[in-house]
Amino acid sequence: MARVPFIAGNWKMNPPKADEAEVLVKELMPRVQGIQKVEVAVCPPATALTAVGRLLDGSSITLGAQDMFWADSGAFTGMISPLMLADVGCKYVILGHSERRGRFGRPDESLGPDATRVFGDTDASVNLKLRAALRHKLTPIVCVGETLPEREAGRTDDVVGGQIRAGLEGVTPEQVAGMVLAYEPVWAIGTGRACEAPEADRVCGLIRRTIQKQFGEAAAAAVRIQYGGSVTDSNAHELLSQPEIDGALVGGASLDAARFSHIIHAASVIARELRKG
């Protein structure tokens, strides 16, 4: 069975107000109404999840969150639990994004010299979150990717493979088959410098082979692997045409309904072409 392309918008800390998030969703919904052969999700800030979820109810667009803690409840100031996300209607949750791991694509002086310790997610904490999400029927979007120094040192495959092996420890092949993995080279995120499509495809293929070795052929064939990192309406078609890339995790371009819908339509067109082929 062919994998259904999956386009997800990671809005990050945008827009600042819930009513602005509602406006963005209202602009997006008619642009993708009736679209086929592709799944779409948006991941707004936590403060807008309820408002956006109400608007999406009954639509073809699903709701996702940008992160979560692994405990269901307790004395964890500032955290959001998987139960809370399920309660507001989330289907997806992004886990292990490089910005949560403290790995940024470009310097941000506002973060100061300790930027790498702002959030500090590790493979171990991502794994705890992953298993908690699965317990509560949330579909994880697990992000992996290398920094520029790691790429220049020829360590891309080791870094990405290691993140997959450690992050997915203790889960079953059936669970892996139903989740989403996202290759996001850290040096491409928010920089306007996307990974070249053939290289993105190569690394996504590496991810699939890593899954095959760890979880078997069926899981590797079923798991969807997105590319993320400066995906735009200009480069989406080339990226999404690659055989190992099953969708995109879109940052800045997802904040513009016209640009985001263009990416979604590109995925739909490619899926229809592949089906005909």
Cite the ranges covered by each PLM segment.
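Active-site loop-to-helix "anion-binding N-cap" substructures in soluble metabolic enzymes
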Residues: 1-277
